[in-house]
A protein has these predicted regions:
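The feature captures the beta-strand-to-loop junction immediately N-terminal to the Walker
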Residues: 41-43
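Short helical segment in ABC ATPase nucleotide-binding domains corresponding to the A-loop/adjacent helical element
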Residues: 99-107, 117, 121
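Non-catalytic connector elements of ABC transporters
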Residues: 244-246, 255-355
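Conserved ABC ATPase "signature" region
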Residues: 72-74, 114-132, 139, 184-185
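Catalytic Walker B motif of ABC-type/P-loop ATPase nucleotide-binding domains
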Residues: 162-166
Length: 355
């Protein structure tokens, strides 16, 4: 599902995990580059957490190989791997201070107290924690502060790879958005390899160098956020990665596609001479005054409008089907609800996915 990298730090070759008759992870091949921020997304039950647990040494593959810098580590215990896992629950010591939590890995290694203290302060600065928090009880920290403590403690292990299991899921939206940017900045500053599991598509798109999409235990597509979003391999990926309009089509000759569930003929870049679906993201649809303003167009009725902060989303009924159109406030629909409208899009803004 991807090209191998010359800077590979982590490789998965046909990795499989079964629990009795249930196949949780099904022959995954993956190559992660050193210093990469790689995120795995997928619906519940897709196998992403089981895959992460195998990488972290908490589960052993039923088949296949996990290689770290070319060395097989399938049976290597988690405490002997140069990796660290940041849990969703954070797993901090609530009865200890911020400094004691961060210093814990260093204390276990026998590092002198003064060296531990200096290192803890260095890590606190890196994760944007005030140095005055060194003696603060973790119990008195906010959710965002505890997240920073957990991250600082993970770096205290000096791991080659940091694994993250949905660490921001329990944090409120505004703070989560701030932490996304900070985590990306920290990744860039340290040059460490990050592997991140999340159900949040926004997190994946904002932070990742590449994204892997899982479904039913399989890694179905790997690519940059731009690739995954604008060039999905199949209909599942297109719909999983965000709102999308899907039109069933069949070939009509002359490079055109004829709508099966909508009237009209459409021109789509890269369309094949076979049945399939035209997929268009809502932001690529626009309101036009005439058919000459776009490669493709459909007439419908605007029947709902939703405010999404800086953007507006419209539902346009075309026959028995509903199209979703998303525009900036500057490009908003100037008419009212239940009024006729012409929705257009260009050939290069749609994707053809064959059946």
């Amino acid at each position: 599902v991807q090209e191998a990298s010359a800077r590979s730090i982590l490789q998965l070759k046909g990795v499989r995990k079964t629990f009795g008759e249930f196949v949780a992870v099904d022959r995954v091949d993956l190559d992660v580059a050193e210093g990469e921020f790689f995120t795995i997304v997928g619906p519940s039950g897709s196998g992403k957490t089981t895959l992460l647990r195998m990488l972290a040494g908490m589960e052993t593959p039923s088949d296949g190989d996990i290689l770290l810098r070319g060395q097989r580590i399938n049976e290597l215990p988690s405490n002997r791997r140069p990796t660290c896992l940041v849990f969703q629950s954070l797993a901090l010591f609530p009865h200890r201070t911020v400094g004691q939590n961060i210093e814990f890995p260093l204390k276990m290694k026998g590092v002198a107290a003064e060296v531990r203290r200096r290192r803890a302060h260095d890590l606190m600065r890196m994760v944007r924690l005030p140095e005055s928090y060194y003696a603060k009880s973790v119990k008195l920290c906010s959710g965002g502060e505890r997240q920073r403590v957990a991250l600082a403690r993970a770096f205290a292990y000096d791991p080659e790879i940091l694994f993250f299991d949905e660490p921001l899921s329990a944090i409120d939206y505004k703070l989560r958005k701030a932490l996304e940017k900070e985590l990306k900045d920290i990744h860039k500053e340290t040059g460490k390899t990050f592997m991140y599991i999340t159900h949040s598509l926004e997190e994946a798109m904002v932070m990742s160098d590449r994204i892997g999409v899982m479904r039913d235990g399989r890694l179905v597509q790997v690519g940059t956020p731009e690739d995954i979003y604008t060039r999905p391999r199949d209909r599942f990926v297109s719909e999983f990665m965000g709102d999308v309009n899907v039109i069933a089509v069949r070939p009509n000759g002359g490079g055109l596609l004829e709508g099966v569930d909508l009237p009209g003929r459409f021109r789509v870049a890269g369309a094949a001479d076979r049945n399939g679906h035209v997929v268009i993201r809502p932001e690529f649809l626009r309101f036009v005054a005439s058919e000459a303003e776009a490669d493709n167009s459909l007439r419908g009725i605007v029947y709902n409008e939703y405010a999404l902060g800086s953007r507006l989303q419209y539902q346009v009924r075309v026959g028995e089907k509903v199209l979703v159109v998303e525009r900036t406030r500057r490009d908003a629909w100037r008419g009212g609800l239940d009024e006729p409208v012409l929705v257009g899009w260009d050939a290069g803004d749609a994707m053809f996915i064959p059946d």
